[in-house]
């Protein structure tokens, strides 16, 4: 077998700054300038709020084919680790969770909407019909799942993945039955895919307004902004820990699981605290007597494009290259000695040059952060009025520029 790429050994950057066609400092300066100019342009030209909130979540029952496919996916996530003897580099299990469900289906959602909801493997049993109200359970489980992905030493081990999904199945099903929760309230993967489907491309004109409205009408379930911020924080940690800068800063401590756990939570706390401070600052300078928690929840959707940009750029290489191993991994899906397709070896086709891949990542990064600035500006006008909108957004702008530079740093250095 020829496997030129294995999960979690792939570098997200392109190798070194010297590989870039233009100086790295120029990339950072121009990117920051683009975000700031977007902010200035909006202040001059966008004087009224035009985006509305209207989303209503309806818990849908899975179709028969969806249940069959979802059951198959669940079996491939759980059984191989307990009945087979496949390693992570040949098992289908890590490919399904970390490529298929983690990045592949969300990208398809840009065109087809929330596909995951039609086969959700964690929602095979009937769920509550109550209206969703909060996503605290989903947020907690998402934090645990990403800790397993980023801190646990063997996130690709089929047995470990199977154990995690047994726990997820028990917790989500138990919460839906005993606490009368809906799937989107307790299933981190369901909520993740629902959020990314909000960026679905539209053929209706004006295209940009339809996409912005689709994001802006995100339901304000309690805890929603924290889930989105965790999406940003976890990828931020993963990006930084893979750089030589991180190792030079902390040395051999980076190999310790205790330190990694501390750093993982610390970065998420920093992201959340910065966001909360930005909301507090907006209220303070506006003079409005509004509840901080309410404003924090209202601005949650403005961070979604950044979360999506982080996610796509970070895992794009896995989607493009690791997905090519699917037939080999499916050749013996349960690790019991089958030979379904007769595939004995596979070679990865790196059809994009490193600089070409980097260019796509930079474009997606800038586009996501620019969308965030637009959404925040529109909401600021709605809440505080046009004359106050720019002042209330200074900290949000600073955070956006900081996240942009951090993302480009991770993508561009070894």
Regions found by a protein language model. Name each.
Residues 2-210, 217-224, 237-238, 370:
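Transmembrane-helix bundle segments that line or gate the permeation/cavity pathway
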Residues 292, 369, 373-400:
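Interfacial loop-to-transmembrane junctions
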Residues 121-129, 185-212, 284-298, 328-346, ...:
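Juxtamembrane inter-helical linkers in multi-pass membrane proteins
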Residues 241-327:
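Long, well-ordered mid-to-C-terminal structural blocks that present hydrophobic/aromatic surfaces
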Residues 311, 390-414:
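Final/C-terminal transmembrane alpha-helix of multipass membrane proteins
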Residues 101, 105-107, 225-236, 302-325, ...:
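Hydrophobic alpha-helical membrane-insertion segments
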Residues 303-311, 318-377:
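Hydrophobic alpha-helical transmembrane segments and adjacent short intramembrane/lumenal linkers
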Residues 26-32, 125, 219, 259-271, ...:
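Hydrophobic alpha-helical transmembrane segments
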């Amino acid at each position: 077998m020829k496997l030129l790429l294995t999960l979690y050994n792939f570098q997200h950057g392109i190798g070194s700054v010297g590989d870039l066609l233009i100086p790295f400092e120029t990339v950072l300066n121009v990117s920051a300038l683009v975000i700031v100019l977007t902010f200035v342009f909006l202040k001059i030209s966008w004087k009224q709020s035009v985006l509305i909130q209207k989303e209503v979540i309806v818990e849908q029952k899975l179709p028969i084919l969806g249940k069959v496919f979802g059951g198959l996916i669940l079996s491939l996530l759980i059984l191989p680790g307990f009945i087979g003897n496949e390693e992570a580099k040949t098992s289908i299990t890590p490919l399904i969770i970390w490529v298929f469900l983690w990045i592949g289906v969300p990208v398809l959602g840009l065109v087809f909407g929330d596909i995951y909801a039609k086969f959700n493997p964690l929602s095979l049993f009937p769920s509550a019909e109550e209206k969703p109200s909060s996503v605290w359970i989903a947020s907690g489980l998402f934090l645990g799942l990403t800790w397993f992905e980023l801190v646990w030493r063997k996130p690709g081990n089929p047995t470990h993945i199977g154990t995690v999904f047994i726990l997820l199945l028990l917790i989500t099903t138990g919460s839906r039955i005993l606490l009368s929760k809906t799937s989107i309230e307790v299933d981190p993967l369901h909520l993740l895919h629902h959020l990314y489907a909000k960026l679905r491309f539209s053929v209706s004109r004006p295209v940009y307004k339809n996409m912005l409205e689709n994001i802006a009408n995100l339901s304000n379930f309690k805890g929603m902004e924290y889930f989105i911020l965790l999406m940003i924080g976890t990828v931020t940690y993963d990006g930084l820990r893979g750089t030589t800068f991180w190792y030079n800063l902390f040395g051999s401590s980076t190999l310790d699981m205790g330190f990694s756990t501390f750093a993982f939570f610390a970065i998420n706390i920093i992201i959340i605290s910065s966001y909360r401070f930005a909301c507090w600052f907006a209220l303070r300078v506006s003079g409005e007597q509004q509840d901080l928690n309410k404003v924090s929840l209202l601005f949650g959707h403005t961070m979604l494009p950044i979360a999506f940009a982080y996610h796509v750029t970070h895992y794009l290489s896995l989607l493009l290259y690791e997905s090519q191993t699917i037939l080999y991994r499916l050749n013996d899906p349960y690790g019991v000695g089958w030979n379904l397709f007769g595939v004995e070896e596979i070679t990865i086709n790196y059809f994009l040059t490193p600089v070409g891949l980097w260019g796509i990542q930079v474009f997606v990064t800038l586009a996501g952060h620019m969308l965030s600035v637009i959404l925040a500006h529109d909401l600021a006008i709605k809440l505080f009025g046009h004359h106050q909108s720019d002042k209330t957004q200074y900290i949000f702008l600073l955070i956006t520029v900081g996240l942009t530079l951090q993302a480009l740093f991770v993508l561009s250095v070894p």
